[in-house]
A protein has these predicted regions:
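A Zn2+-metalloprotease active-site environment signal
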Residues: 2-8, 17-252
Length: 252
């Protein structure tokens, strides 16, 4: 999650697939690519998210509608609501042992069955709320801009097909994985934590699941050696922040 940073540090999130066979004839100069990426409109970001989500869904094993995972997620989704700042959302479950979840700017929310096995409903609600926060607060859009502007999945936006038409299916899939595994700053992580807390309160859900989800991660992180994710806030500290907010709000 983005709660995911802790999960990535534990090595349980999906590995990022590189895009090593791109045709350089289709690329603009790095300066022009960066300009295009940072000029993305909300509509372009949603269009790219639509295609990236479709490509990832096509490669994943989706939980059947009548499965226990889907029925459980449907219940969780009804508690969280059907939109992010007015953007309709759609939920689904990827059947995988990986512990992860993500949300895209088009409302694509995917929860991994490994996460659902690890956490109770209240904790899954909190994790999804955190992911929704990254979308609502613009973090995901900026992550897409960075992916298009500086990473392997950089292609020109042709005036006749638009930026989506300039990406192959594999490149869209790679872009999706970039977004799923995106790293966010400590400030962005804290903002998404607070967004989830506020969303849970607004929806009448006890926010304790946010704290206990971090506490579960902290237990798994114990004894872990220094990693590239050490610049992200520790799960224990994030759990304590939520506990402090709950105490200030008079929540047990």
């Amino acid at each position: 999650m983005k709660i995911r940073q802790a999960l990535l540090a534990l090595g349980v999130a999906a590995a990022l697939t590189g895009c090593q066979n791109m045709d350089s004839n289709g690329l603009l100069s790095s300066g022009a690519e960066a300009f295009q990426a940072y000029s993305l409109s909300d509509a372009q970001v949603k269009a790219l998210s639509d295609e990236s989500c479709k490509e990832m869904d096509s490669k994943a094993t989706l939980a059947p509608a009548n499965s226990a995972y889907r029925q459980r997620l449907d219940k969780i989704a009804s508690a969280l609501g059907d939109n992010i700042n007015g953007q309709p959302v759609n939920y689904n479950v990827y059947i995988t042992k990986d512990v992860n979840a993500f949300a895209m700017a088009n409302g694509c929310i995917r929860v991994y069955s490994g996460l659902m096995d690890m956490m109770n409903d209240n904790e899954v609600e909190a994790v999804i709320g955190h992911e929704m926060g990254h979308v609502a607060l613009g973090h995901v859009k900026r992550g897409m801009q960075v992916a298009l502007g500086t990473n392997a999945v950089r292609v020109a936006a042709a005036s006749a097909g638009g930026i989506v038409g300039s990406l192959s299916q594999s490149q869209l899939g790679d872009l999706g994985e970039k977004l799923v595994n995106a790293q966010f700053s400590q400030r962005q992580e804290a903002e998404a934590d607070d967004y989830s807390y506020d969303l849970l309160r607004k929806r009448g859900i006890n926010p304790s699941g946010l704290a206990t989800s971090f506490e579960k991660l902290a237990q798994q992180e114990a004894g872990r050696q220094s990693t590239m994710f050490d610049d992200h806030p520790a799960s224990e500290a994030r759990a304590q922040h939520i506990r402090d907010r709950m105490a200030a709000d008079g929540i047990n």
